[in-house]
Amino acid sequence: MIAPFEYSLSTILSLFSKDQDWKRTDNPTFRWITTSSSETKARSLFVPLRGTRDGHEFIPDALSKGATAFLCEKNHPILKTLSNADQSKAIVVSDCLLALGVIASYHRMRFKPMILAVTGSSGKTTTKDLLGGLFGFLKQKSLVVTEKNYNNEIGLPFTLFRITEETRVVICELGMNHRGEIARLSRITKPTHALITNIGSAHIENLKSREAIAEEKIDIISGMAESSVLFVPDDLDFLYRAKLKKLKTKIKLIVWNHKEKPNLKVKK
């Protein structure tokens, strides 16, 4: 993945200052941020991630294609294999995936669009696309909608990197593969509005019950301010109410269902 990225080196360093032993005196400006060495361009910030292979292995390739700097996890052995000149381009972090989220959250907080986050056991993508269609009257640069399945800790930041001063509405899909992920994604996104589509049996092998799944989904409020709005289905709304009461939050709760006549309608 790659996205436009207009930040100075000093700005990125300031986000991770406690981990740095920085020796360079220049302050170049990045033009791109990428997790793929094959997509790296000149003036990129390369973020190596661990998957089937360790992304740190591709740091030399990214540097050969013009990367200005790269993130690197503290004490990673790849550093000892690099020249002194290339070592000087390392921005040391404790975890590259978490660092990507920190950078994305910093970018998101520079702007003030309405951000609507969608999660649930099913129907997330359809709902996200429908909401995107409802805001289709906006100019192209004013609307950002999650593309493809970019709904996890890797893809979500690249949705947020598309936000600019012209952006008025952002529709984000938040997915979940393991416990705690929705909370982390919400803290990165900081939604102004959130919608839970439903609570089904997806992930029940890990979470054991629909109630536990509902608890996990409501963690979408983790990054929401008290002026935010949460839309939830009516079948487990008692859990949502109890959670909000326990947290003593003033997030507004709107319960919806598929059966009764709606009391809210969308107008252009």
Residue positions per predicted region:
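Short, basic, low-complexity termini and linkers enriched in Ser/Thr/Gly/Pro
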Residues: 84-87, 244-252, 266
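Short, polar loop motifs at secondary-structure junctions
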Residues: 71-78, 234-237, 258-261
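Short beta->alpha junction loops/turns
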Residues: 51-52, 93-96, 149, 175, ...
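Conserved beta-strand termini and adjacent loop/short-helix elements that scaffold enzyme active sites
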Residues: 19, 23-25, 93, 146, ...
